[in-house]
Curated annotation (Swiss-Prot):
Keywords: ANK repeat, Repeat. It comes from Acanthamoeba polyphaga mimivirus. PROSITE patterns: ANK_REP_REGION, ANK_REPEAT. The keyword Acetylation does not apply. The keyword Repeat applies. This is Putative ankyrin repeat protein R911. It holds the Pfam family Ank_2. It comes from the Viruses.
Length: 467
């Protein structure tokens, strides 16, 4: 049937259906490609629809010098290059070869194909590209650097055999291999002359930071300085909770008190209790920097760390009760309760705790603070105003039930709820008597300015004037 239909009819069929695959059913249909109105990239279509047999067929036609390929403009070099790179990254060697046969440039994008296939560990693709003339040294030896960073030892070895420079970019290869914990790659690079001390001992610092104990031990055995950059290694190992690395570094002479006891402060901040306990046994000072450790453990909700630090003498009321104020602000109810049980002042800094708990929508914290005597009316009803501004409906309703004045500060609550598009809050406030016309119809003007159509429509229905 295909061969009996005239070309004019096929052009109409393809234009009407939008289905370019009809052109791929018979070689003669390629002749119609320049006649149809559909602007479809044939290679894009073939690749996106996994029509590999068509790709092979196109390759054969190209090899035979068929005029369909030679004379017709159906092969887009940018598209060929795009899918060459994509398939190199996906280890599709057969497809890569067909794309190259159709004219794809293996060196497109500054030899990105060999860089990506190296980065992803596709050794056979890498070898093929190198045999076809790819430059493995492109982009400051990107290929070997990221093959190292991703732990592809065999690719690294092959690239080195082909002349790759493992020391490019300030020994980036061993830095990356250490950062990601690829011990065998690290050992191989060292055997090939990589400098583990480059960039202020980047390798051991990053291996420590990321908890790669075996890499750390190996680098130390090769002469790495664990105290570089103000004892960065032990500080960041502590910050990230890598206890075994911390212990090892301490055994090698790391100073846990460097940078104002950074190690215990950040371990506390991030909730790494075992690291904190160990550092305390080694003599760290948990009260440095105005009791930073307990303050930030509280701020981040790390209750067990908070309890331990207090047991070791941390001062919970330091810095104007920072601990309970920020635990409240961030919604950490159990921490708040514990601190209050030990004497923290929830009313410090003009009732900061309840104001910010309200503004951030932490209803259970707000309820608890009110039960403990917090004043929700301070700072001109800051609590309900900011709960309204941020759309925390449940908090608003609770505060109103406790006597908050929604009209404080020239009807701030409804103005800002409107400006920020909180329709249900606006409706609730209006039902309680909020004046939507306050400050020259501020509410509707700013709701309109910010594009909150439903709020605008509601306010207008309630008598607001949109000038």
């Amino acid at each position: 049937m295909y061969d009996t239909l005239p070309p004019e009819l096929w052009v109409q069929i393809v234009d009407y259906s939008g289905e370019i695959s009809l052109l791929l059913t018979n070689t003669s249909f390629f002749e119609l490609f320049n006649l149809i109105n559909i602007k479809t990239d044939i290679i894009e279509y073939v690749m996106e629809n996994d029509l590999i047999d068509i790709l092979k067929y196109l390759s054969l036609l190209k090899k035979l010098g068929h005029p369909i390929i030679v004379d017709k403009n159906i092969l887009n070099i940018k598209t060929l290059n795009k899918y060459l790179i994509k398939n190199c990254g996906e280890n599709q060697l057969e497809i890569v070869k067909f794309l190259v046969s159709l004219g794809a440039d293996i060196r497109a994008g500054n030899d990105y194909a060999v860089g990506l296939s190296s980065q992803n560990g596709h050794l056979e693709v890498v070898k093929y590209l190198v045999n076809q003339g790819s430059d493995i040294r492109a982009e400051n030896d990107y290929a070997v650097r990221w093959a190292s960073g991703n732990g592809h030892l065999e690719v690294v070895k092959y690239l080195v055999s082909q002349g790759a420079n493992i020391r490019a970019d300030n020994d980036h290869a061993i830095g990356l291999a250490s950062y990601y914990g690829y011990l065998e790659v690290v050992k191989y690079l060292v055997s090939q002359g990589a400098d583990i001390r480059s960039d202020n001992d980047y390798a051991v610092r990053m291996a420590s930071r990321n908890g790669h104990i075996e890499v750390v031990e190996y680098l130390v055995s090769q002469g790495a300085n664990i105290r570089s950059d103000n004892d960065y290694a032990v500080r960041l190992a502590s910050q990230n909770g890598h206890l075994e690395v911390v212990k090892y570094l301490v055994s090698q002479g790391a100073d846990i008190k460097s940078d104002n006891d950074y190690a215990v402060r950040l371990a506390s901040q991030n909730g790494h209790l075992e690291v904190v306990e160990y550092l305390v046994t080694q003599g760290t000072n948990i009260r440095v920097n105005n009791n930073y450790a307990v303050e930030w453990a509280s701020k981040n909700g790390n209750l067990e760390v908070v309890k331990y630090l207090i047991s070791q003498g941390a001062d919970i009321i330091a810095d104007n009760n920072f601990a309970v104020r920020w635990a409240s602000r961030n919604g950490h109810l159990e921490v708040v309760k514990y601190l209050v049980s030990l004497g923290a002042d929830i009313k410090s800094d003009n009732d900061y705790a309840v104001r910010w708990a309200s503004g951030n929508g932490h209803l259970e914290v707000v309820k608890y603070l009110v039960s403990q005597g917090s004043d929700i009316r301070v700072e001109n009803d800051y609590a309900v105003r900011w709960a309204s501004r941020n759309g925390h409906f449940d908090v608003i309703k609770y505060l109103v039930s406790q006597g908050a004045d929604i009209r404080s500060d020239n009807d701030y609550a409804v103005k800002w709820a409107s400006e920020n598009g909180h329709l249900e809050v606006v409706k609730f406030l209006v039902s309680l008597g909020a004046d939507i016309k306050a400050e020259d119809d501020y509410a509707v003007r700013w709701a309109s300015e910010k594009g909150h159509l439903e709020v605008v429509e509601y306010l207008v229905s309630q008598g607001a004037v949109l000038s």
